[in-house]
Amino acid sequence: MSQIKNNFIESVGNTPLIKLKAASEITGCNIYGKAEYLNPGGSVKDRAALALIKDAQEKKLISEGGIVVEGTAGNTGIGLCLLGNSLGYKTIIVMNDNQTQEKKDTLKNIGADLRLVPPKPYKDDGNYVKVAGRLAEELKSTNNNGVVWAN
């Protein structure tokens, strides 16, 4: 039976456990898989995104009209953007330009401000995570509703 949720945030988590029949029969015990792909963003990373945003809200680092910045390979950014949309936050995602076109298109289609950078090792200042951190710091002086580097 489907459950109606009051808002987008309530749809994150509470994904079902599914009994893995063959594995259960082979082992003689019940084996279950957690169906995290049924989160609204299609990934367990939706849970991490929600925790990051809730933490920022509790610390009063962001309010409606604020900006969430993240350097990501995709799934966390998708979760952050979907949650940000529902809470009135702008989401800026910094990612390597060699990520899959599907992830880039998904992020653009759900409203992320996508910033692509060439792939660089973490020790390099041009690494997407470091670029995201600098961008968040720069934006803090221009937004009164808060800027959070989700990192």
Predicted regions and their residues:
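PLP-dependent amino-acid enzyme catalytic core
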Residues: 1-151
